C-alpha cells in the first residue's frame, strides 16, 4: 500500500512540474510574439524544461521512497503484517498517504506561484499548457485515478475515525448514564433509608416519651377491699365538675337522684332538686324545654369541639393496675382509672404547637403526648365551701374520685355485700366440714364390740 501511494505521488508531482515548466517557458517569450501551435519552438523548449523538472521530481521522489521504505520496515516488524497491502490496518493508510503529500505540496505551490506571475494577457501561453496535458493522457489518467483514490481514502479514514470515536463515546456515555441512573436510585434509597431511620427515631422517641410518662399511684380512700368513698371529697369533685368540666363533658349515664344515695355525695333531697333544676331538658311529650328533675340524668354534651362523655371514663382507663393477672393488684390498689385522670389533668407543661389548623398542648400522661384540650385547671379556680385549698393537684384528685363514683356508684354496697358473702361462705364451709366429720366418724372409726 505504501509503495503504490509513493509511485502515484511521484507521477502527480512530475505532471505538476511539467505543467509549471511549460507555463514558465511561455512567460519568458517577448510580448506580442507568438509561435504556431505545432512549431518546433514549443517542442524544443518543452524538452529542456521536462529534462530540468525530471531531476527535481526524482529528487523529490527519493526522500518519499526512503520514507516509504522506512514505513515498510516498521510495518514488516509487526507480526500481524502480511505481504498484501489490503490486509494492513486502515489506520495506517492516512499516515502513509499524508507523508508523500506533504512533500508534493511545495512543488504544487511553486507551480501555482509561477502561474500567478504569468500575465493573463498571453493566450498563446495558455494554449501549449492546454495541449501538453493532452499529449500525455496515460500519465494524467493514473494521476487523476490516484488523486481520486486518495481523495475518497482520506474522507473515508476521517469518517472512520469519528465513527470509531463515536461508539467509544457512546460506550463511555452509556456507562456514565447507567452510573448516573444507578446513583439516582441509590440516592433515593439512601434518602428513603434516612427518612425511615428518622421516622423510626421519631417513633422511638415518642414511644420512649410515652413509656417514660409515669402515672403515680395515688392512695384513694375507696381502694382496697374495705375502702369507701369520702363523702366530702365527692362533693368537692361534683363542684369541680359542675364549674369546670360540665361545659364540654357530659354524664349521660348518671341519674341526678343518685347524688342523694348512701355511698355517694349524699346531698339532701332539696339540694338535689335545686341542683337538677339548673339544667334544662326537652320534654318528649310537650316538646318544650323544662328544668330537670332528680329522675332525669345529667345532660349530654355533644357537638363539634366537645369532649367525650365522662360517665364511665374511670373504668374505661382501667389499665394501670391490670387488668390481666390474678386480680389481686386490682383488689388492693384499684383499677387505675382515677390515677390516669389525675395524671392527665396535672400533666400539662405549658408547651403547645399548631398542627392542621388546630392547637395542640403537650401532656406527658396522654397517649402521643399531644392533646387538643387545653389545661382545664388552675390554682384557686374553684372556691371550696369547706375551705380546702383549691390547688390543681387537689382539684384533680377530687374530680377523679367523683368520676370513679359515677363509674361505680354502687361500689361501697358491692364491697359490703362481698365482705358479708365471704364471711358467710367461711362460716358455711366450717359448718359443712364439722357436719361431714360428725357423719363419717362412726363409719371410719366404728366401735369395737365388747
UniProtKB/Swiss-Prot annotation:
Modification(s) after translation: Binds 1 heme c group covalently per subunit.
Annotated InterPro entries: Cyt_c-like_dom (IPR009056), Cyt_c-like_dom_sf (IPR036909), Cyt_c1 (IPR002326)
Composition bias type Low complexity, residue spans: 24-58
Signal peptide region: 1-21
Any Gene Ontology CC annotation: plasma membrane
Sequence segments annotated as region (Disordered): 24-210, 284-305
Localization in the cell: Cell membrane
The keyword Transport appears for this protein: yes
Annotated Acidic residues bias: 59-77, 85-108, 118-194
Annotated TM spans: 421-435
Keywords associated with the record: Cell membrane, Electron transport, Heme, Iron, Membrane, Metal-binding, Respiratory chain, Signal, Transmembrane, Transmembrane helix, Transport
Gene Ontology molecular function, alphabetical: electron transfer activity; heme binding; metal ion binding
Function (record text): Component of the ubiquinol-cytochrome c reductase complex (complex III or cytochrome b-c1 complex), which is a respiratory chain that generates an electrochemical potential coupled to ATP synthesis. c1 functions as an electron donor to cytochrome c.
Subunit note: The main subunits of complex b-c1 are: cytochrome b, cytochrome c1 and the Rieske protein.
PANTHER family associated with the record: CYTOCHROME C1, CYTOCHROME C1, HEME PROTEIN, MITOCHONDRIAL
Protein name: Cytochrome c1
Amino acid at each position: 500500500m505504501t509503495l503504490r501511494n509513493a509511485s502515484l505521488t511521484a507521477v502527480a508531482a512530475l505532471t505538476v512540474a511539467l505543467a509549471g515548466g511549460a507555463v514558465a517557458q511561455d512567460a519568458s517569450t517577448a510580448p506580442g510574439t507568438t509561435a504556431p501551435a505545432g512549431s518546433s519552438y514549443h517542442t524544443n523548449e518543452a524538452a529542456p524544461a521536462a529534462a530540468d523538472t525530471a531531476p527535481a521530481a526524482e529528487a523529490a521522489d527519493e526522500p518519499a521512497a526512503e520514507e516509504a521504505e522506512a514505513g515498510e520496515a516498521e510495518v514488516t516488524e509487526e507480526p500481524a503484517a502480511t505481504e498484501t497491502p489490503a490486509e494492513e490496518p486502515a489506520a495506517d493508510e492516512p499516515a502513509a498517504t499524508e507523508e508523500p503529500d506533504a512533500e508534493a505540496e511545495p512543488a504544487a505551490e511553486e507551480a501555482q506561484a509561477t502561474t500567478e506571475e504569468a500575465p493573463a494577457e498571453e493566450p498563446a501561453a495558455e494554449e501549449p499548457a492546454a495541449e501538453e496535458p493532452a499529449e500525455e493522457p496515460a500519465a494524467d489518467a493514473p494521476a487523476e485515478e490516484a488523486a481520486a483514490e486518495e481523495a475518497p481514502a482520506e474522507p473515508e479514514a476521517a469518517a472512520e475515525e469519528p465513527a470509531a470515536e463515536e461508539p467509544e463515546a457512546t460506550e463511555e456515555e452509556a456507562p456514565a448514564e447507567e452510573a448516573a441512573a444507578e446513583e439516582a436510585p441509590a440516592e433515593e434509597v439512601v434518602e428513603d433509608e434516612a427518612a425511615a431511620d428518622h421516622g423510626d427515631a421519631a417513633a422511638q422517641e415518642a414511644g420512649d416519651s410515652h413509656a417514660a410518662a409515669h402515672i403515680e399511684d395515688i392512695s384513694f380512700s375507696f381502694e382496697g377491699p374495705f375502702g369507701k368513698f369520702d363523702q366530702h371529697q365527692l362533693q368537692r369533685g361534683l363542684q369541680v365538675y359542675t364549674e369546670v368540666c360540665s361545659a364540654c363533658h357530659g354524664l349521660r349515664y348518671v341519674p341526678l337522684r343518685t347524688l342523694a344515695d348512701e355511698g355517694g355525695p349524699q346531698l339532701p333531697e332539696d339540694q338535689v332538686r335545686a341542683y337538677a333544676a339548673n339544667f334544662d331538658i326537652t320534654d318528649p311529650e310537650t316538646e318544650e324545654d323544662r328544668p330537670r328533675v332528680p329522675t332525669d340524668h345529667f345532660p349530654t354534651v355533644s357537638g363539634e369541639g366537645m369532649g367525650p362523655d365522662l360517665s364511665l371514663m374511670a373504668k374505661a382507663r382501667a389499665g394501670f393496675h391490670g387488668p390481666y393477672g390474678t386480680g389481686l393488684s386490682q383488689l388492693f390498689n384499684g383499677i387505675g382509672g382515677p390515677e390516669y385522670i389525675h395524671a392527665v389533668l396535672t400533666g400539662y407543661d405549658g408547651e403547645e404547637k399548631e398542627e392542621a389548623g388546630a392547637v395542640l398542648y403537650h401532656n406527658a400522661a396522654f397517649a402521643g403526648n399531644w392533646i387538643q384540650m387545653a389545661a382545664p385547671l388552675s390554682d384557686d379556680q374553684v372556691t371550696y365551701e369547706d375551705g380546702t385549698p383549691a390547688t390543681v393537684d387537689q382539684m384533680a384528685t377530687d374530680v377523679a374520685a367523683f368520676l370513679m363514683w359515677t363509674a361505680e356508684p354502687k361500689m361501697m354496697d358491692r364491697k359490703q355485700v362481698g365482705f358479708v358473702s365471704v364471711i358467710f361462705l367461711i362460716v358455711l364451709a366450717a359448718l359443712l366440714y364439722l357436719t361431714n366429720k360428725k357423719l363419717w366418724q362412726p363409719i371410719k372409726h366404728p366401735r369395737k364390740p365388747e
